[in-house]
């Protein structure tokens, strides 16, 4: 067979198949980008607080992280096309509920839970369906197209979501997703299923429950740490032994994950299919690749939670203006991810990833300089662009590292672990860095009020009491309304507003500092990434679907 024949599409409807898969990829990527630039509008529409929307965003990523591997196993058992179809139907139901959501609870059920479950079925099946419908060069080209569509979704998402949110309503984005999913379902009949090798795997429901519960407790404890406190209790529902429940909840999650690993080994000893073959995690390159995927998305999604708070709440920009100012991250990340594979051949993935981490640290240092009461728009855009370069360098390497570290039979499982690491990073980024911002806001505000001679002792005491029940990230008009409602003298009210504004910037900078610190610590995780020698030997050409740009949100 000639190269041309080997690269030919599996059937005459290949273009329609590729369009179908590309549409699904775009829908999966679009969601979180829209939510990130709509935070302040969601707070206003549902009359809630930033921390509540933070929880909704975190839950979305957590559901996907907890169910991604199980979703892949269900695809292996049902058939990838059937899992893809069922996932899309569940996703469309979630989008429809989100579009008409009347409360935060409905939003969480529709977006975080139903869309998260649907995505956990769609995403593992999507990559397998490419392999089932394309061969040779056509398959590599299809993966490249999907990578490009995902990158375009990251770039377009903040602009599209911001414009629709500002000029119409964010609900239309999710209504539009329902229409897109219906179109995908119609086109799906032209697609052939991915072939299944061997007998369908046995489902490990106990393992799924243990892993999902463990991850949930760890993320929940991290998310609530800003409210409950890490050690000393602040606004905690319970106080075990007089301490905050945060570490107890996280430790409980760790215990469940330990039980999960024991259960997986037990199933393997019995000759039954485990949810995850733990021996794969002994592969150094795979382990490092997964750790770096986790770190990359923790940093990126944490910063993507911070930036809208600064732009919308501190600066007063609307969602569209916020999307425009965050656009350089997406553009430079996408562009650099296209160029990154070329660098790997010269320097090796390890060095390219380390350079990316250095660039991220530099961008965090730059953010510390530009997060001021009066924004320097040019400087802010430059720093955002630099951040995208660092992220793009990392993203360009890790997909190929993970896929090249296992054989053909292990690529499906490696892909599931990769998506789990990405979504867990997204959940932890929003939870951890968001908790540091909220906790830092309370701590800094109290310190500044106590040090301000214009604030009376009685008011200082009252502020301390109020902070025990939590603090909200308020815009200037909201803060002014709260001060007016308290009936304070004008001079004292002005002093409180000034202290609160300073505390907001201190809290945001604390979150940026944590992101930079995580980038520095992540150098440890690069140790087992392949260097140039290995890249030349066996990873120089990306395996199908492993190279090229990989969206950070998928």
Task: Locate predicted features.
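Transmembrane core module of solute transporters
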Residues: 14-64, 68, 169, 241-248, ...
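Helix-loop-helix hairpins in multi-pass membrane proteins, especially solute transporters
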Residues: 74-215, 224, 241, 247
């Amino acid at each position: 067979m000639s190269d041309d024949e080997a690269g030919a599409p599996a059937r005459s409807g290949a273009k329609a198949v590729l369009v179908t898969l590309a549409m699904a990829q775009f829908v999966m990527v679009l969601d979180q980008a829209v939510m990130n630039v709509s935070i302040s509008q969601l707070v206003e529409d549902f009359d809630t607080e930033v921390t509540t929307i933070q929880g909704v965003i975190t839950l979305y990523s957590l559901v996907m992280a907890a169910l991604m591997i199980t979703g892949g196993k269900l695809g292996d058992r049902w058939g990838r096309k059937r899992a893809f179809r069922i996932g899309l139907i569940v996703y469309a139901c979630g989008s429809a509920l989100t579009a008409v959501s009347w409360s935060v609870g409905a939003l969480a059920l529709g977006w975080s839970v139903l869309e998260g479950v649907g995505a956990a079925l769609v995403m593992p099946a999507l990559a397998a369906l490419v392999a089932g419908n394309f061969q040779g060069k056509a398959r590599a080209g299809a993966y490249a197209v999907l990578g490009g569509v995902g990158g375009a979704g990251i770039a377009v998402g903040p602009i599209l979501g911001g414009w629709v949110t500002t000029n119409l309503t964010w609900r239309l984005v999710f209504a539009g997703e329902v229409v897109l999913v219906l179109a995908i379902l119609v086109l799906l009949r032209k697609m052939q299923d991915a072939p299944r090798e061997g007998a369908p795997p046995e489902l490990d429901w106990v393992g799924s429950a243990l892993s999902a519960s463990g991850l949930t407790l760890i993320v929940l404890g991290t998310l609530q740490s800003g409210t409950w406190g890490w050690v000393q209790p602040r606004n905690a529902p319970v106080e075990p032994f007089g301490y905050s429940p945060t570490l107890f909840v996280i430790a409980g999650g760790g215990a469940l994950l330990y039980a999960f690993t024991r259960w997986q080994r037990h199933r393997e000893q019995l000759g039954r299919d485990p949810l995850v073959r733990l021996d794969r995690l002994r592969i150094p390159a795979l382990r490092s690749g997964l750790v770096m995927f986790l770190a990359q998305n923790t940093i990126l999604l944490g910063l993507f939670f911070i930036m809208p708070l600064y732009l919308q709440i501190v600066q007063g920009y609307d969602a569209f203006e916020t999307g425009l100012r965050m656009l350089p991250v997406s553009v430079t990340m996408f562009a650099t991810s296209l160029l990154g594979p070329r660098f790997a051949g010269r320097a090796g993935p390890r060095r390219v990833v380390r350079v990316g981490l250095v660039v991220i640290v530099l961008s965090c240092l730059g953010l510390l300089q530009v997060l001021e009461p009066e924004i320097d728009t040019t400087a802010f855009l430059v720093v955002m662009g630099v951040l995208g370069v660092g992220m793009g360098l990392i993203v360009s390497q890790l997909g190929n590292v993970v896929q090249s570290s296992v054989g053909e039979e292990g690529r499906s499982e490696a892909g599931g672990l990769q998506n789990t690491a990405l979504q867990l990073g997204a959940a932890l980024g929003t939870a951890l860095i968001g908790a540091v911002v909220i906790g830092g806001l309370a701590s800094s505000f109290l310190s500044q009020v106590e040090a301000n001679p214009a604030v009376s002792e009685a008011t200082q005491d009252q502020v301390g009491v109020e902070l025990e029940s939590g603090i909200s990230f308020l815009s200037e008009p909201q803060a002014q309304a709260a001060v007016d409602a308290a009936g304070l003298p004008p001079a004292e009210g002005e002093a409180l507003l000034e202290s609160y504004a300073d505390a907001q910037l201190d809290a945001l900078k604390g979150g940026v500092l944590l992101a930079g610190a995580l980038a520095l610590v992540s150098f440890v995780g690069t140790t087992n990434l392949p260097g140039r020698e290995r890249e030349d030997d066996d990873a120089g050409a990306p395996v199908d679907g492993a190279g090229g740009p990989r969206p950070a949100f998928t």
